[in-house]
């Protein structure tokens, strides 16, 4: 109450922010008359002048007003489009590490040109990030004339480009591309073998379009570059035949009784669990097929792989549905993005799930994968020096943007008032009643000439509605993952008189639905259109536009509530753009997923109290409130999962940053001789300590063991016992010096034989290859650790602390192994000439070329399990990296040790 009074008196935080920025808009507007009088050459020269001022010490804030005014004037000349004042506000928000919420149709693409130009002046690179290749190409080509007019270069980074093409794209002032491609290029750069193979520059400024989709929806799906592991397709096929024999539990276990069945499904958590009865049945079936020894348990250590395959097959059959979660196309299982409804070719589920789905569908089973490199979008984007984003729906997730990324959200007012009518939800008892009402509503809209966009949550639902409309002889277009090639065309014409378009979820997002149809696209398809043809198309469009406005504008019809309010708002936001007329309504049934899982009891009791009968709908604020509360529950749960994923990945991220920094230092260094000398000393001292402990008597020395180890692992034949027998004054310290000295002389002899330059190159190649191999094994070990770590909660231990401690121990072991392996290879291998080094590098490149780079969307289920054992801890706010860590500074991983004794050991 008190807060509301303060807001009335002083305005909300958003109002105060906009008021402050409004002063700068006034300055920009004051420059408009002056810049209108400039010639094209004088306007273009402003770019050179701005760059000169920045080089002399001025900041971007100092030149912002003038730069924005220049972009506005250039846009008027190139596009015949003038930036509105609200777009100027949006541009300033985007330049200040914040998120701008701008409604659909308010010109986000044009708004982005302002901060992109301003930050492009620095020459450090601007990355404008979109959700798919089509939008990246479209926005780059649309805005290229403006940026090139002002002297800035534009690059496009999409899948399928060669190394040189990618490098050219990244060297441009402004680079458009998809989030996946930027992330994978970062990982690929950190798998490179020479500086010339890297394509990215340091990450400077990222401007993310549809920021909620990328930073929220995709946050649970880490990017993984993987290579094919062993072939186990036959095992997946055999295990797949077991699942039809299992029966779902008819009721959940309670204290009084045990449900009758082999497995139970937790729909809220999207998990499946085998019951004791199910485990016994699977063991019998496996034994019958000769896959399990008589009397052996599925849960014994030797059968963990079998258990993994059974669980994957069970999940594939019970939790993943064809035409909802994936489609089968060209003998391949292709994932459907649950948030956008688009297919994701090349993406694969991890942990054997994709192979299990392939076995279920009877298509070719591809090999399992081994992780070579991975990162979450959260940790990738937090590496940018500046980060900003824009979307039509960010306010509902404002807390998460601030909490995880440190980004405030500013709601930008619309240029014209919003007049769309959002009707209350209609709730029916059954889906049949709901679909009958939807068809009736569509028929009414068609009679009025009002276009309709029908939003569905799955391909299956969109095809069901399409069949119903066909039966009713209602002309319609279907836009889902199966027909994404025609996406832009279908969306562009969805605003024509009486048009009916069925769209899966938010497929088609990023393309405006223009009332009366998109006249610009009609002109585009013509070859050299005359002015008369263009004028006729525009005249015809104006007639259609007026008819549609008179009929009520675009009507949005939702067939089910999504588990996120934001996705529902995105669907509604397709109507009412730039002050257009429009309306929206959601039709629900008690059997919808959200209603069944979260809201059924409360709403059912309300319906009974109101005496509902078949075919009747309920429309009441109580129902809308109950549904919204259900959505809040799901949003809170999903936020917790994303937060946990980040907390776990932060541990791996510290290690990732250290390894990648070391790789880059190794690649950039002309010589790593000093590093090799330091490692050599560490290895020798550690080895001698094992067999001849410091300050110990000779009786405790294991000289034969030391000699054997030196010869077997390092190829060094040292007569240590002979030295001791002949020289009475040889004690532990002088013996250590003798061994080191002999080792160094042996290595120097190798250097004299092959030449210093060849050996320096060979050292670098060995160090990189060994580090890459061990890092790959370390990632696999971390995956295994994470998958079972939640069980520590049942032993009254904190899973996150245990994960942090054990992963640090694994990392320490990896560093020690790296030292020993590198010195072992350098000591034993005989390098004959430069050609040996080149052959080694070529072999590495050939192996790299064979890697099947499956870009996986990994599941976060192992992390979700930690919820059962541990309550969520408070999350540490994100702090962007500052200066380089000194060797004597505390290690950033939080171990309490000095950096040089912890993650800095390699340096």
Swiss-Prot record:
One of its GO terms (molecular function) is protein-exporting ATPase activity. It is an enzyme of class 7 (translocase). Its EC number is 7.4.2.8. It catalyses: ATP + H2O + cellular proteinSide 1 = ADP + phosphate + cellular proteinSide 2. This is Protein translocase subunit SecA. It is found in: Cell inner membrane; Cytoplasm. Zn(2+) binds at residues 891, 893, 902-903. The keyword Repeat does not apply. Belongs to the SecA family. May bind 1 zinc ion per subunit. Residues 878-887 have a biased composition (Basic and acidic residues). Its main location: membrane. Residues 869-897 are annotated as: Disordered. Its cofactor is Zn(2+). SMART domains: SecA_DEAD (SM00957), SecA_PP_bind (SM00958). Monomer and homodimer. Part of the essential Sec protein translocation apparatus which comprises SecA, SecYEG and auxiliary proteins SecDF-YajC and YidC. It comes from Shewanella sediminis (strain HAW-EB3).
């Amino acid at each position: 109450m008190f807060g509301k009074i303060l807001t009335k008196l002083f305005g909300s935080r958003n109002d105060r922010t906009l008021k402050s920025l409004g002063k700068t808009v006034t300055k920009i507007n004051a420059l408009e008359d002056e810049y209108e009088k400039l010639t094209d050459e004088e306007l273009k020269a402003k770019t050179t002048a701005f760059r000169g001022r920045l080089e002399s010490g001025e900041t971007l804030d100092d030149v912002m007003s003038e730069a924005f005014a220049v972009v506005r004037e250039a846009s008027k000349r190139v596009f015949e489009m003038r930036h509105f004042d609200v777009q100027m506000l949006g541009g300033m928000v985007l330049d200040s590490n914040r998120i701008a919420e701008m409604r659909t149709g308010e010109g986000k693409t044009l708004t982005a040109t302002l901060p992109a130009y301003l930050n492009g002046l620095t020459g450090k690179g601007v990355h404008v990030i979109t959700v798919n290749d089509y939008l990246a190409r479209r926005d780059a080509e649309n805005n290229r004339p403006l940026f090139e007019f002002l002297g800035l270069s534009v690059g496009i980074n999409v899948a399928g480009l060669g190394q040189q093409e990618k490098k050219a794209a990244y060297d441009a002032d402004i680079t458009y591309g998809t989030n996946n491609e930027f992330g994978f290029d970062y990982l690929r750069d950190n798998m490179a073998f020479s500086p010339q193979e890297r394509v990215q520059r340091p990450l400077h400024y990222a401007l993310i379009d549809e920021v909620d989709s990328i930073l929220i929806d995709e946050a649970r799906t880490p990017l993984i570059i993987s290579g094919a592991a062993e072939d186990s397709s036959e095992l997946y096929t055999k295990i797949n035949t077991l699942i039809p024999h299992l029966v779902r539990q008819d009721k959940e276990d309670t204290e009084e009784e045990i449900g009758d069945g082999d497995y139970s499904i937790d729909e809220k958590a999207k998990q499946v669990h085998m019951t004791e009865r199910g485990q016994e049945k699977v063991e019998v079936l496996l034994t019958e097929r000769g896959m399990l020894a008589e009397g052996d348990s599925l849960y014994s250590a030797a059968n963990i792989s079998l258990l993994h395959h059974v669980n994957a097959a069970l999940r594939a059959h019970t939790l993943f549905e064809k035409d909802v979660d994936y489609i089968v196309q060209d003998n391949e299982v292709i994932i459907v993005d649950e948030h956008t409804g688009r297919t994701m070719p090349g993406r694969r589920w991890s942990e054997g799930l994709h192979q299990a789905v392939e076995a279920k569908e009877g298509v070719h089973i591809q090999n399992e994968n081994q992780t070579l490199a991975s990162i979450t979008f959260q940790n990738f984007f937090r590496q940018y020096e500046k980060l900003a984003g824009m979307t039509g729906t960010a306010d509902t997730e404002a807390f998460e943007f601030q909490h995880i990324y440190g980004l405030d959200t500013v709601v930008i007012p619309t240029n014209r008032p919003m007049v769309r009518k959002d009707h209350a939800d209609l709730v029916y008892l059954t889906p049949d009643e709901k679909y009958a009402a939807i068809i009736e509503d569509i028929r009414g809209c068609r009679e009025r000439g009002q276009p309709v966009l029908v939003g569905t949550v799955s391909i299956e639902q969109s095809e069901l509605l399409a069949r119903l409309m066909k039966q009713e002889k209602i002309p319609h277009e279907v836009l889902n993952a199966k027909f994404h090639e025609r996406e832009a065309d279908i969306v562009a014409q969805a605003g024509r008189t009486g048009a009916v378009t069925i769209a899966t979820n938010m497929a088609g997002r990023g393309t405006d639905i223009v009332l009366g149809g998109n006249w610009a696209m009609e002109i585009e398809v013509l070859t050299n259109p005359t002015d008369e043809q263009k004028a006729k198309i525009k005249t015809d469009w104006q007639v259609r536009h007026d008819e549609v406005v008179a009929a009520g504008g675009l009507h949005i019809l939702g067939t089910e509530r999504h588990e996120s309010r934001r996705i529902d708002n995105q669907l509604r936001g397709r109507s009412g753009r730039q002050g257009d007329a429009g309306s929206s309504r959601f039709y629900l049934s008690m059997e919808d997923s959200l209603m069944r899982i979260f809201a059924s009891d409360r709403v059912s009791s309300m319906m009974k109290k109101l005496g509902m009968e078949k075919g009747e709908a309920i429309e009441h604020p109580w129902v809308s409130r109950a549904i919204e509360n259900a959505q809040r529950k799901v949003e809170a749960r999903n936020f917790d999962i994303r937060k946990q994923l980040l907390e776990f990945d932060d541990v791996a991220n510290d290690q990732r940053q250290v390894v990648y920094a070391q790789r880059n230092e190794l690649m950039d260094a002309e010589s790593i001789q000093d590093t090799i000398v330091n490692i050599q000393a560490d290895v020798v001292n550690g080895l001698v300590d094992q067999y001849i402990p410091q300050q110990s008597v000779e009786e405790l020395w294991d000289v034969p063991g030391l000699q054997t180890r030196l010869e077997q692992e390092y190829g060094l034949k040292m007569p240590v016992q002979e030295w001791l027998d002949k020289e009475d004054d040889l004690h532990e310290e002088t013996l250590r010096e003798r061994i080191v000295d002999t080792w160094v002389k042996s290595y120097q002899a190798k250097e004299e034989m092959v030449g210093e330059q060849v050996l320096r190159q060979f050292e670098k190649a060995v160090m990189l290859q060994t580090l890459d191999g061990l890092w790959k094994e370390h990632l696999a070990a971390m995956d295994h650790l994470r998958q079972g770590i939640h069980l520590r909660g049942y032993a009254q231990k904190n899973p996150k602390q245990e994960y942090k401690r054990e992963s640090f121990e694994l990392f320490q072991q990896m560093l020690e192994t790296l030292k020993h392996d590198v010195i072992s290879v350098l000591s034993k291998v005989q390098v004959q000439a430069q050609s040996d080094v080149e052959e080694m590098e070529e072999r590495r490149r050939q192996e790299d070329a064979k890697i099947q780079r499956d870009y996986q969307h990994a599941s976060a289920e192992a992390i979700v399990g930690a919820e059962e054992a541990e309550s969520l801890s408070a999350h540490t706010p994100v702090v962007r990296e500052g200066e380089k860590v000194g060797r004597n500074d505390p290690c950033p991983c939080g171990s309490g040790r000095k950096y040089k004794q912890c993650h800095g050991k390699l340096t």
